[in-house]
Amino acid sequence: MKLPITLLTLAALSFHSLAQEESLTPIFNGRNLDGWNTDDALVASHWLISDGQIIGDNPDKKGSVLWTKANYNNYELNLYFQTDSPDYDSGVFVRGPSHQVQIGVSRSLKIDLTGCIYCPKDLQGKYPIQSDKVKTTHKLGEWNALKIRVINNRIVTHLNGELINDYMTAAMPKEGPIGLQVHAGVHQKMRFKNLEIQPTRYDEPGVVEPQYDGIPVPVPNGATVLFDGKDLSLWRGMPRKGVENPAGEVRWKVESGFMQVTPRQGGITLKEPLLTSGHLHIEWATPAEVTDQGQGRGNSGVFIQGFPEVQVLDSFNNKTYHDGQASALYKHAPPLVNASRGPGKWQKYDIHFSRAEVENGKVTKPAYLTVYHNGILTQDKIPFLNRAQNGGLSLQDHNNPVRFRNIWFLPTE
């Protein structure tokens, strides 16, 4: 059943409302390290239990990580940490060793990164550096409350009740263990207690009535038309695996005011970059004849300025994974709701994005991405720290003859 929805209702939807939360469960019983890997010699010599606390102590200045035996996917982790060490470098690894929530002063960057995300091998390139809130929120020598929320490729941290970081990674493992670290190079004694985890899962996005009738939207004053329905002179072709295209030949066809993907011949990309923040409007339609299901049904995508793919898919009565539906940020964030029209019907995306602001190599304002699908808010100002700003705009060939029309860009800078 489709549900009526209003802008007020949509404004009330949040990142937290996407997920159904289960009860909090201790991952440390306060007595021993049952449930933690203790086979490693460094673990045995560096970690102990006292007064209901896990204590990491490295007088030899060697590094060690205490890992859970269990792997975790999406969750909220709550814990307390404390140290009397004047110099310390610790952290909590999420889903294995690639992404860490830092505690203390980074040995490499020489600044307090508590609550920030340390992931130097992230495909985004640079990773978030110190949050100004750390300076006033982190209580040295006292117990600090750390909350870590991991949903798909997003990591959100709160320190003593204050939001410190909201970070969308380029890629991270689907699941993995949680690790407590004492870093090499400095003697430190880290204390952890009250470690509790709350697994989360996504519900199927609710189906709502689209607020779009399929009529082309007029181009506003000041907008640049990127496809007028006549030719693809502003675009060039892209190679794909097994298909060479050194000359950038566009192999899609144009007819009746729309362009159409030629399956397995490569996507297309705009020749000139979009160098400002702005509003991208694009209309699209999946094939009217349904010949497949899931990800094989009207699949394409919109890539803009290095943000994750805005998924194009026939999601009308079509079950698939939540972060692969129409208007999902593919494998990053599912849509708030499913606002899809039926197969063969024209649909529209209005994608609003702002570029990150950087001063002296430090991000002072993250990039943001908001998506409206058929007039309904489906991605609400998703932040991206240090997202590569390459200015590109590309449309994907995912083996389906998806159509596009009426593409324009309105700068907001």
Predicted regions and their residues:
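Carbohydrate-interacting regions of secretory-pathway proteins
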Residues: 20-413
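Bacterial Sec-dependent N-terminal signal peptides
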Residues: 1-21
